[in-house]
């Protein structure tokens, strides 16, 4: 049986591209760590018998540096017998000034008094810093020597 060289060349060319079993495809690995973490957290909360608190519209966490972690749409679960509270949501880091008008009705009288004291302390500290900065600026010019080309200060150091 004679072999047609053209057909043989076409078959060899096709077989070079398509290996037996098809081409190998690489699958992108999906990171499922966040869903695993959430399921572990949910399991622990079920063990603690946490109760979901409804009708919570927002939550604010005040940090020491003066910023606020603001949760606009928040889910809350509480396990009071274990002194545990869990807040779900996407936090936004905001300054206190951004949230200030909306926060006042939510705060108690003690917190408002503390805020007014903090504001007065900040204003007095800023005023003191400005007064202290003015004499320092004049004194700094005296201590700084002028640079002269060719002059070195190595002799003074030794």
From Swiss-Prot:
Region (Disordered): 14-42, 122-158
Highest taxon of the lineage: Eukaryota
InterPro entries cross-referenced by the UniProt entry: BTF3, NAC_A/B_dom_sf, Nas_poly-pep-assoc_cplx_dom
Disulfide bond sites: none
Gene Ontology CC annotations of this record: cytoplasm; nucleus
Alphabetized PROSITE patterns for the sequence: NAC_AB (PS51151)
Keyword Oxidoreductase attached: no
Cell compartments where the protein resides: Cytoplasm; Nucleus
Function according to Swiss-Prot or TrEMBL: Component of the nascent polypeptide-associated complex (NAC), a dynamic component of the ribosomal exit tunnel, protecting the emerging polypeptides from interaction with other cytoplasmic proteins to ensure appropriate nascent protein targeting. The NAC complex also promotes mitochondrial protein import by enhancing productive ribosome interactions with the outer mitochondrial membrane and blocks the inappropriate interaction of ribosomes translating non-secretory nascent polypeptides with translocation sites in the membrane of the endoplasmic reticulum.
Self-association state and partner proteins as the record states: Part of the nascent polypeptide-associated complex (NAC), consisting of EGD2 and EGD1. NAC associates with ribosomes via EGD1.
Name the UniProt record assigns to this protein: Nascent polypeptide-associated complex subunit beta
Species, as recorded: Kluyveromyces lactis (strain ATCC 8585 / CBS 2359 / DSM 70799 / NBRC 1267 / NRRL Y-1140 / WM37)
């Amino acid at each position: 049986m004679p072999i047609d060289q053209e057909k043989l060349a076409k078959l060899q060319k096709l077989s070079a591209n398509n290996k037996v079993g098809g081409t190998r495809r690489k699958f992108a690995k999906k990171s499922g760590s966040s869903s695993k973490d959430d399921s572990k957290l949910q399991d622990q909360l079920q063990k603690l018998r946490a109760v979901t608190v409804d009708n919570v519209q927002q939550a604010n966490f005040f940090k020491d540096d003066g910023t606020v972690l603001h949760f606009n749409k928040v889910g809350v679960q509480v396990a009071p017998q274990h002194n545990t509270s869990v807040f779900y949501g996407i936090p936004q880091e905001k300054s206190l000034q951004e949230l200030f008008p909306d926060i006042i009705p939510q705060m108690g009288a003690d917190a408002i008094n503390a805020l007014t004291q903090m504001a007065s302390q900040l204003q007095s500290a800023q005023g003191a810093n400005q007064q202290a900065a003015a004499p320092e600026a004049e004194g700094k010019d005296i201590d700084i020597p002028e640079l002269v080309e060719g002059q070195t200060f190595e002799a003074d150091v030794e």
